[in-house]
UniProtKB/Swiss-Prot annotation:
Belongs to the intermediate filament family. Disruption phenotype: Mutant mice are viable, reproduce normally and do not exhibit gross morphological defects. Increased levels of intermediate filament proteins Vim in the spinal cord and Ina in L5 ventral roots, and a reduction in the number of L5 unmyelinated sensory fibers. More and longer type II spiral ganglion neuron neurites during cochlear neuritogenesis at P1. Residues 1-42, 453-475 are annotated as: Disordered. It comes from Mus musculus (Mouse). It comes from the Eukaryota. Keywords: Cell projection, Coiled coil, Cytoplasm, Cytoskeleton, Intermediate filament, Nitration, Phosphoprotein. Gene3D superfamilies: 1.20.5.170, Single helix bin, Vasodilator-stimulated phosphoprotein. This is Peripherin. InterPro entries: IF_conserved, IF_rod_dom, Intermed_filament_DNA-bd, Intermediate_filament, Keratin_I.
Length: 475
């Protein structure tokens, strides 16, 4: 693009310089030394060159429009001739004006070439943006819709997973609650059994104490009975000894008596002896039977007390074993209960954390969706702004195209005003101008873009241009 712009710039500048040099040679001829007769030729050609340069650019035509010949009246040139110094000064002024106009024309051509290059660059950007916009129109809404639908499906799937996980956790929680209630009920039953066992143990201890007291009392009774039996045995033995002594003494006496007494007395003594022996044997047998009965009763009572004591000890040991087993079971149930409660708290905390994470994820996805919507809205605003810029650029391009066509039409018009000019050899005599001020209407068009809408305002301005009297008097 820069090469084409530079080529167009060089072509237009070369064309204008060739036209200007050709019109200069046609009007003024080759640059020989000036003569007094060439003054009228140069002075008359100033108006034609002013017309030619007035068609070169809007600025030069606006600036040099005041030098056009007035509609009413014409300058009358006297027959006097100017001297060589005046022709020299006019020629220098004309050359300076021509050089300034050529420089301004060159600058305007450069600016115009830059504008053309900028317009081409903006047209390329506009075409690229149109392609991107068409691609974005064709793809991005569907893609954004697909992304939104996919994210919504993922969110729904995550919500379903969360719902199922929540239901599962609730079922587990209900099961754990039921297990906990059963364990609590079992713990209460075991606690009640333990209390009953402890109460029975207290009663058994009381019974054991009573049995111990009874046993001690019975042992004391047994000891007293044994002492009594021993005393009775001793008494019986003493009685037996006394009886034996008495019997022996009686036998001795009987022998002595038998020797002296009659046989009737011996028989009587023998009867008495037999009676006493029967009484002694009967007393001994009764004492032995009483002793045996008492001993049997005491043995039976001791055996009964011993059996009751043994049963009480056995029941006490069994109660102790039951209490120990129940205590161990209660401790185990307490540990299980604490573990279940801890697991329940951990599950609740984990569920709360997961729910918070899912809520944060849902909020993040909603925020991303909102950002995507904002970005889409921003892209649409940028696209609208680009459309506005494109519209403004199209308007500017059309304006520059019209200006360029007008300039080219002005340049291509053949110069006929040079032949109609009469070459005078006299110094012009100034007459009062009928219209010293020329009026010019200027159309000002302003193009603005407000809120995506193009606003075009036009205004007309009346411009007054005074003739340069010093320039006119210089003729």
């Amino acid at each position: 693009m820069p090469s084409s712009a530079s080529m167009s710039h060089h072509h237009s500048s070369g064309l204008r310089s060739s036209i200007s040099s050709t019109s200069y040679r046609r009007t003024f001829g080759p640059p020989p030394s000036l003569s007094p007769g060439a003054f009228s030729y140069s002075s008359s050609s100033r108006f034609s060159s002013s017309r030619l340069l007035g068609s070169g650019s809007p600025s030069s035509s606006a600036r040099l429009g005041s030098f056009r010949a007035p509609r009413a009246g014409a300058l009358r040139l006297p027959s006097e001739r100017l001297d060589f110094s005046m022709a020299e000064a006019l020629n220098q002024e004309f050359l300076a004006t021509r050089s300034n106009e050529k420089q301004e024309l060159q600058e305007l051509n450069d600016r115009f070439a830059n504008f053309i290059e900028k317009v081409r660059f903006l047209e390329q950007q506009n075409a690229a943006l149109r392609g991107e916009l068409s691609q974005a129109r064709g793809q991005e809404p569907a893609r954004a819709d697909q992304l939104c639908q996919q994210e919504l499906r993922e969110l729904r799937r995550e919500l379903e997973l969360l719902g199922r996980e929540r239901d599962r956790v609730q079922v587990e929680r209900d099961g754990l609650a039921e297990d906990l209630a059963a364990l609590k009920q079992r713990l209460e039953e075991e606690t009640r059994k333990r209390e009953d066992a402890e109460h029975n143990l207290v009663l058994f201890r009381k019974d054991v104490d009573d049995a111990t007291l009874s046993r001690l009392e019975l042992e004391r009774k047994i000891e007293s009975l044994m002492d009594e039996i021993e005393f009775l045995k001793k008494l019986h033995e003493e009685e037996l000894r006394d009886l034996q002594v008495s019997v022996e003494s009686q036998q001795v006496q009987q022998v002595e008596v038998e020797a002296t007494v009659k046989p009737e007395l011996t028989a009587a003594l023998r009867d008495i002896r037999a009676q006493y022996e029967n009484i002694a044997a009967k007393n001994l047998q009764e004492a032995e039977e009483w002793y045996k009965s008492k001993y049997a009763d005491l043995s039976d009572a001791a055996n009964r007390n011993h059996e009751a004591l043994r049963q009480a000890k056995q029941e006490m040991n069994e109660s102790r074993r039951q209490i120990q087993s129940l205590t161990c079971e209660v401790d185990g149930l307490r540990g299980t209960n604490e573990a279940l409660l801890r697991q329940l708290r951990e599950l609740e905390e984990q569920f709360a954390l997961e729910a918070g994470g899912y809520q944060a994820g849902a909020a993040r996805l909603e925020e991303e969706l909102r950002q995507l919507k904002e970005e889409m809205a921003r892209h649409l605003r940028e696209y609208q702004e680009l459309l506005n810029v494109k519209m403004a650029l199209d308007i500017e391009i059309a304006t520059y195209r019209k200006l360029l066509e007008g300039e080219e039409s002005r340049i291509s018009v053949p110069v006929h005003s040079f032949a109609s000019l009469s070459l005078k050899t006299t110094v012009p005599e100034m007459e009062p101008l009928q219209d010293s001020h020329s009026k010019k209407m200027v159309l000002i068009r302003t193009i603005e873009t407000r809120d995506g809408e193009k606003v075009v305002t036009e205004s007309q301005k009346e411009q007054h241009s005074d003739l340069d009297k010093s320039s006119i008097h210089s003729y």
